């Protein structure tokens, strides 16, 4: 959903454009932002549409979305086209490992019901090397990788070296 990081980024002083292909999701995000006193430019659009319109941004955030898009290459190509020269993109996604199957599918969907069943298809998760290869084909490179871990005991996320479940990639144009 478009508001995953849009509201926190706006609160930190960024000028935010939040997009989602779903008009319904954008409506929910707009209502929440307005109730919070935030003026976020939410649009029911795709990255491909924004790139075709010639839009450019200092930072592009693709958070927990690449494992859901129909055409990964087209999506990443559009995201790269949206980056201004010297800009960056952050991609957050799930690695395709036995650990990610255990935590994201069995744990989050089946046992804990944090997500609706079928939200994820493990076969669509991307190994960091696969993401890097897709980005290279689009004139970009992964500058840094960092793992993301969630602790249910503290209800907090932490960054680290373990890429086995969730990870983020800092992407720059090559």
Language-model-detected regions and their locations in the chain:
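Short low-complexity, flexible loop/linker segments enriched in glycine and/or proline
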Residues: 32-38, 106-107, 157-161
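Core SAM-dependent methyltransferase catalytic element
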Residues: 140, 156-174
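Short alpha-helix
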Residues: 122-145
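Class I S-adenosyl-L-methionine
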Residues: 148-158
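Acceptor-substrate binding/catalytic loop of class I
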Residues: 93, 110-130
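Short, flexible, mixed-charge acidic loops at enzyme active sites
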Residues: 100-110
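Residue-level recognition of beta-strand->loop/alpha-helix junctions
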Residues: 20, 146-147
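Conserved SAM-binding loop
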Residues: 1-100, 128-131, 169-173
């Amino acid at each position: 959903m478009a508001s995953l990081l849009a509201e926190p980024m706006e609160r930190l002083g960024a000028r935010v454009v939040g997009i989602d292909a779903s008009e319904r999701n954008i409506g929910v995000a707009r209502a929440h932002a307005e109730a919070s006193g935030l003026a976020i430019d939410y649009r029911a659009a795709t990255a491909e549409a924004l790139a075709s319109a010639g839009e450019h941004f200092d930072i592009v955030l693709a958070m927990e979305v690449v494992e859901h898009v129909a055409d990964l290459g087209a999506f990443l190509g559009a995201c790269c086209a949206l980056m201004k020269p010297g800009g960056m993109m952050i991609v957050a996604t799930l690695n395709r490992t036995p650990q990610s199957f255990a935590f994201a599918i069995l744990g989050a969907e089946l046992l804990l019901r944090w997500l609706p069943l079928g939200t994820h298809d493990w076969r669509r998760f991307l190994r960091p090397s696969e993401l890097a290869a897709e980005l290279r084909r689009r004139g970009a490179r992964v500058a840094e990788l960092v793992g993301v871990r969630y602790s249910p005991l503290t209800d907090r996320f932490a960054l680290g070296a373990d890429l086995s479940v969730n990870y983020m990639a800092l992407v720059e144009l090559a």
